[in-house]
UniProtKB/Swiss-Prot annotation:
PANTHER family to which the protein is assigned, alphabetical: PROTEASE HTPX
One BP term from GO: proteolysis
HAMAP family: Pept_M48_protease_HtpX (MF_00188)
Subcellular location: Cell inner membrane
Cofactors demanded by this protein: Zn(2+)
Species in which this protein is naturally found: Paraburkholderia phymatum (strain DSM 17167 / CIP 108236 / LMG 21445 / STM815) (Burkholderia phymatum)
Residue pairs linked by disulfide bridges in the UniProt entry: none
GO-annotated cellular components: plasma membrane
Membrane topology note: Multi-pass membrane protein
Chief site of localization: membrane
Gene field: htpX
Pfam families xref list: Peptidase_M48
Residues that bind Zn(2+): H131, H135, E202
Superkingdom of the source species: Bacteria
Protein name: Protease HtpX homolog
Length: 285
C-alpha cells in the first residue's frame, strides 16, 4: 500500500512540473497543453514504461531453450520467493549490471547484461538475481520504472524550452530568463528520482535477496566485482538515458556530474558490510 501512495505522489509531482514548464513555454495555453501531456504520460508510464525501458536497452527476451542455465536459475529463485515466473531478458553490453521492471509481480521482467554473465560465478549470479526478485516481491519496480521514464520526459521538455524558447499568452516571445529557469528543472527531475527511489530500498533488496538465495556472502562478492568492473567499463545506453540508472543493481554511470545527480545507490562498501554481517550472524535483519 505504501508504494502505491508513493507512486501517486510521484505522478502528482511530475504532473505539476509539466504544468510549470508548459506555462513557461506557452503561458496559460501551454499549461493546459502540458496538463494533457502529463495525464497521457502518467497513463502511458503505468501501462507501458517497462516495455519502453527494455526497448531502450535493446533487451532480448530469452527462454529455457536460448539461455537454459540462466532461465532455470531465475525459475528456481522465483519459486523460492513464491513469485510468478518473470520474463527474462539479456542485454548485449560489456558492463556487468542487472535490473527488474514491470508494474507488479504478475507483469515483471528481469534483465541482465551479457557482461555480468561473463564476470560472475553461478553462485554470485544467483545472489544478484535474488536481489532483483526482492525488488519484484516488494513491488519496488513500478515506481522505479515510472520515475525513470517520466524524469527523462521532464528533462527533454526542459531542454526544448531552453533551446527553442516560448511564448506568453499574447503570443509574444517569452523572457529568456524563463527559458534558463525551465532548463534548471532537469536537475529537479533528478532530485525527484532521489526522493522517490530511496537508498534504503537498495539495502532492503540486498536483505531480501540474501533471504531468497540463502547466501548473503555471494551477493557481497558479486557487488564487489560489479563495482570494480562498472567503474572501468562504459555503458553507453545508460549514459544516454541517465534517469534509468537508478534501476540497476549498481550505478552504471561514471563518477561526477550526472552520476552524482542520479546517484540513488548507497555506497558499495556499506552494502557489502551489511551482507557480510548477515553471513556472520545468520540473521537477515
Amino acid at each position: 500500500m505504501f508504494n502505491w501512495v508513493k507512486t501517486a505522489m510521484l505522478m502528482a509531482a511530475i504532473t505539476a512540473l509539466f504544468i510549470v514548464i508548459g506555462g513557461m513555454i506557452g503561458g496559460r495555453s501551454g499549461m493546459m497543453f502540458a496538463l494533457l501531456i502529463a495525464l497521457g504520460m502518467n497513463f502511458f508510464s503505468y501501462w507501458f514504461s517497462d516495455k519502453m525501458v527494455l526497448r531502450m536497452y535493446n533487451a532480448q527476451e530469452v527462454d529455457e531453450t536460448s539461455a537454459p542455465q540462466f532461465y532455470r536459475m531465475i525459475r528456481d529463485l522465483a519459486t523460492r520467493a513464491n513469485l510468478p515466473m518473470p520474463r527474462v531478458y539479456l542485454i548485449d553490453e560489456d558492463q556487468p549490471n542487472a535490473f527488474a521492471t514491470g508494474r507488479n509481480p504478475e507483469h515483471a521482467a528481469v534483465a541482465a547484461t551479457t557482461g555480468i554473465l561473463r564476470v560472475l560465478s553461478e553462485r554470485e549470479m544467483r545472489g544478484v538475481m535474488a536481489h532483483e526478485l526482492s525488488h519484484v516481491k516488494h513491488r519496488d519496480i513500478l515506481i522505479s520504472t515510472i520515475s525513470a521514464t517520466m524524469a527523462g520526459a521532464i528533462s527533454a521538455l526542459a531542454n526544448f524550452a531552453m533551446f527553442f524558447g516560448g511564448r506568453d499568452e499574447n503570443g509574444r516571445p517569452a523572457n529568456p530568463i524563463a527559458g534558463i529557469a525551465v532548463a534548471l528543472l532537469a536537475p529537479i527531475a533528478g532530485a525527484l528520482i532521489q526522493m522517490a527511489i530511496s537508498r534504503a530500498r537498495e539495502f532492503e533488496a540486498d536483505r531480501g535477496g540474501a533471504q531468497i538465495s540463502g547466501d548473503p556472502q555471494a551477493l557481497a562478492s558479486a557487488l564487489d566485482k560489479i563495482h570494480r568492473y562498472a567503474n572501468g567499463i562504459p555503458f553507453p545506453t545508460a549514459e544516454a538515458h541517465p534517469a534509468t540508472a537508478q534501476m540497476m543493481i549498481m550505478n552504471p554511470l561514471a563518477g561526477g556530474g550526472i552520476a552524482n545527480l542520479f546517484s540513488t545507490h548507497p555506497s558499495t562498501e556499506e552494502r557489502i558490510a551489511r551482507l557480510m554481517e548477515m553471513a556472520r550472524t545468520g540473521r537477515f535483519e
